[in-house]
């Protein structure tokens, strides 16, 4: 089971399986909509921040489809190396942030931030709040933070390719929770943590975001499972 991404093998395993799962409909359209990527003048827009960019396929997609500049950061040097080698783009800057700091960015210079499947990897709520606070410092007034995670109300439910947690188990906030992604490329097991909807909302509100809202997202169209699979939490700087 993967608990960190500091080896090239772990990063490549993650990239291979998430690509095979067809990542784009897995909550990402709602993220892009929240950041108004399709309606913003890309020539004059400030860059987008991707906090926890992983192997970079989302960032290249944003650059290619929407023409937006992206600053993509990750604590894993292996993920950044993989992103630079496989998903480079003139509009995307990849940066390794081993200490999770964003000090290289100025105050209020970012036009929006996405952070996908990152807060659910954090073992304590104080860390979640601190990361959101660091992000908020970089955002222009009125800019949006869009946080995407799997839906905590669907723990234990088997979707087409994904299951979070064990069936019939009751989790408490902060409990370790195994995520299992099954594709034709193999089985990927990830170490995540259980957090309620209210915990994610708290992380943004405690960091100073306002107008915090939630959206309960269904699985991709090809998956008929009648439960929300993803949770999007949005807040305005």
Swiss-Prot record:
Give a yes or no for keyword rRNA-binding in this entry: no
Task: Please name the top-level EC class of this enzyme.
Answer: transferase
A molecular function annotated in GO for this UniProt entry is: methyltransferase activity
Top-level taxon in the UniProt lineage: Bacteria
Give EC number(s), comma-separated.
2.1.1.328
Keywords attached to this Swiss-Prot or TrEMBL record, sorted alphabetically, are: Antibiotic biosynthesis, Methyltransferase, S-adenosyl-L-methionine, Transferase
What did gene disruption experiments reveal? Answer: Cells lacking this gene accumulate N-demethylindolmycin and are unable to produce indolmycin.
Catalytic activities: N-demethylindolmycin + S-adenosyl-L-methionine = indolmycin + S-adenosyl-L-homocysteine + H(+)
- Which Pfam families does the protein's record reference? Methyltransf_25
Give one GO biological process term. Answer: antibiotic biosynthetic process
Similarity comment: family membership: Belongs to the methyltransferase superfamily.
Summary of the function given for this chain in its UniProt record: Involved in the biosynthesis of the antibiotic indolmycin, an inhibitor of the bacterial tryptophan-tRNA synthetases. Catalyzes the methylation of N-demethylindolmycin to yield indolmycin, with S-adenosylmethionine (AdoMet) acting as the methyl donor.
Q: Which PANTHER family is this protein grouped with?
A: TRANS-ACONITATE 2-METHYLTRANSFERASE, TRANS-ACONITATE 2-METHYLTRANSFERASE-RELATED
Q: From the Swiss-Prot or TrEMBL record, give the protein name.
A: N-demethylindolmycin N-methyltransferase
Q: Specify the species.
A: Streptomyces griseus
């Amino acid at each position: 089971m993967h608990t960190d991404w500091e080896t090239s093998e772990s990063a490549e395993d993650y990239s291979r399986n998430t690509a095979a799962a067809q990542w784009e409909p897995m909550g990402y359209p709602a993220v892009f909509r929240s950041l108004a990527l399709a309606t913003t003048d890309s020539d004059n827009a400030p860059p987008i921040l991707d906090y926890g960019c992983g192997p970079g396929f989302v960032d290249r997609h944003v650059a290619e489809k929407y023409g937006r500049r992206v600053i993509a950061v990750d604590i894993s040097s292996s993920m950044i190396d993989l992103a630079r080698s496989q998903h480079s783009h003139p509009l995307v800057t990849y940066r390794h942030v081993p200490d999770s700091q964003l000090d290289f960015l100025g105050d209020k210079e970012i036009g929006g931030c996405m952070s996908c499947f990152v807060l659910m990897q954090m073992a304590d709520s104080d860390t979640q709040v601190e990361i959101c606070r660091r992000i908020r410092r970089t955002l222009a007034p009125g800019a949006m933070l869009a946080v995407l995670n799997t839906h905590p109300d669907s723990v234990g439910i088997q979707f087409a390719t994904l299951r979070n947690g064990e069936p019939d188990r009751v989790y408490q906030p902060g409990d370790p929770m195994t995520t299992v992604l099954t594709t034709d490329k193999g089985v990927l097991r990830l170490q995540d943590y259980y957090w309620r909807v209210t915990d994610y909302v708290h992380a943004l509100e405690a960091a100073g975001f306002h107008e915090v809202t939630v959206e309960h997202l269904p699985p991709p169209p090809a998956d008929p499972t009648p439960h929300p699979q993803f949770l999007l939490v949005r807040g305005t700087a």
